[in-house]
Regions:
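Short amphipathic alpha-helical face segments that pack within enzyme cores
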Residues: 129-137
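Active-site proximal loop and beta-alpha junction motif in alpha/beta enzyme cores
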Residues: 1-124, 136-177
Length: 177
């Protein structure tokens, strides 16, 4: 697919990432379920009552051009993503596998830290669709503002969910020629 982009300042680009899909068959999931409340048994038993896990043990699923599940926790840096990421990525309810994000939303509701497991790639330092999916899920659940900054290990992106389409703004650099 082709995405529209505009230049913002010297190094930033603003990209229209399109609309999020929330229907179970568009993510896709293997069976009909509430995509805002997806529970996986081993996640629940592994993390229930752990100090870095706040709230419920459910994930929020959506598709931003690829499937994502987002877990909101008090400290995403404490999650062993290398252990849990591949188990969730390949879980039976995800016929096309899934990107896995653990996210921590700041008290000001404007900043979100993430720890991402990208399907087929493993732990990643940054992922644009994960940033968009996380910001949209946080906003839909009333955890974050409509505009937020998503922080990865190696950088940040500004995400705007104020319209049906999601807009991502951040620096662009050449990685490989």
């Amino acid at each position: 697919r082709v995405l529209d982009a505009e230049i913002v300042g010297e190094k930033n680009k603003k990209i229209n990432m399109g609309k999020a899909k929330f229907n179970w068959n568009e993510i896709p999931l293997s069976k009909e379920m509430n995509t805002e409340w997806v529970e996986i048994d081993f996640v629940k038993t592994t993390f229930l009552n752990k100090p870095h896990w706040s709230g419920d043990t459910h994930g929020f699923c959506l598709n931003i051009g690829n499937p994502h599940i987002i877990y909101f926790v008090s400290d995403c840096s404490k999650i062993n993503i290398k252990e849990l990421g591949p188990k969730i990525e390949n879980y039976k309810i995800f016929p096309e596998r899934v990107n896995v994000t653990f996210a921590s939303v700041s008290a000001d509701r404007e900043n979100i830290k993430v720890n991402v497991w990208e399907r087929g790639a493993g732990q990643t330092k940054a992922c644009g669709t994960a940033a968009c999916a996380t910001a949209k899920a946080a906003w839909c659940q009333g955890l974050a503002n409509v505009n937020s900054n998503v922080h990865f290990k190696d950088g940040s992106l500004q995400i705007d969910c104020s319209t049906d389409n999601i807009f991502m703004t951040g620096p662009v650099s050449e990685v490989k020629k």
